[in-house]
Design a protein with these regions (language model features):
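Active-site "gating" loop of Rossmann-like NAD(P)-dependent oxidoreductase/epimerase domains
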Residues: 3-27, 42
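Active-site Tyr-X1-5-Lys
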Residues: 23-50, 64
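Flexible, glycine-rich beta-alpha linker
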Residues: 50-67
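Substrate-binding strand-loop-helix patch
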Residues: 59-60, 87-94, 113-133, 174-176, ...
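Substrate-positioning beta->alpha
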Residues: 62-68, 81-104, 111
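A short C-terminal helix-loop "cap" of Rossmann-like NAD(P)-dependent dehydrogenase/epimerase domains
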Residues: 69-81, 135-141, 145
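Mid/C-terminal beta-alpha module of Rossmann-like enzyme folds, strongest
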Residues: 97, 102-159, 192, 196-201, ...
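C-terminal amphipathic/interface module of NAD(P)-dependent oxidoreductases
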Residues: 157-209
């Protein structure tokens, strides 16, 4: 499933028993996930449901870390939403697969689990780590809040956090961001054409430079 099932006004970090409702940022994507959860539980009452935050790593075709990798490889300045304090919560696809294996093997008591890294990371620190995968250090340009963030950056201006206490009971250790991003960068170098790129550079060069 997805963290998009939780409305943006809920109390964070979101526990699994939080209200599920439309989120103004995710819209139909989130409500479709709610409907899918309901349909699954009607058919398979003892099914397991996993709700991740932002996934990253090999085979991620969404233009998120790949966008920052492109900026690093092109020695571009990085246009940062304000000062980059907003935090993002991630989960590496390898951790997701390993967690699924644990669930299949151990059949834990909890059947609905938020999954993800326990600690979130600021946009600024995340970009620094992405550039470091190519032995680069980013030069930042601060973009004011008045500029629509999704025009030049991969994430909405929406900070959220999942409570992953249930996950930690059965899968306490997740991959470090440094190792996870390096793995993602190595994959991207060989599979750049598999990522659905967006025209962030075009917007930046036309409107922000």
């Amino acid at each position: 499933s997805s963290s998009a099932v939780y409305p943006e006004y809920g109390v964070q970090p979101f526990p699994e028993d939080s209200e599920r409702a439309v989120n103004k940022f995710w819209g139909k994507y989130g409500t479709d996930k709610i409907e899918a959860e309901n349909a699954l539980l009607e058919r398979v009452p003892d099914a397991y449901i996993l709700r991740p935050p932002y996934l990253y790593g090999s085979m991620d075709n969404v233009y998120r870390e790949a966008f920052v990798f492109d900026c690093a490889m092109a020695d571009r300045k990085f246009y940062l939403p304000e000062v980059g304090e907003m935090k993002l919560q991630f989960f590496h696809v390898e951790d997701l697969c390993r967690l699924m294996e644990v669930i299949i093997t151990k059949c834990p008591t909890d059947h609905i689990l938020n999954v993800g890294n326990e600690k979130s990371i600021s946009i600024r620190d995340w970009v620094i780590k992405c550039y470091a995968c190519f032995d680069k250090v980013p030069e930042f340009v601060s973009v004011p809040e008045t500029v629509e963030q999704r025009n030049y950056f991969s994430f909405y201006n929406y900070e959220y956090c999942l409570d992953v206490t249930r996950q930690k009971k059965i899968y306490p250790e997740t991959m470090s961001m440094d190792a996870g991003l390096q793995e993602a960068a190595n994959w991207y170098i060989e599979h750049e054409g598999e990522v659905n790129k967006k025209p962030y550079w075009e917007y930046i060069d036309t409107n922000l430079v």
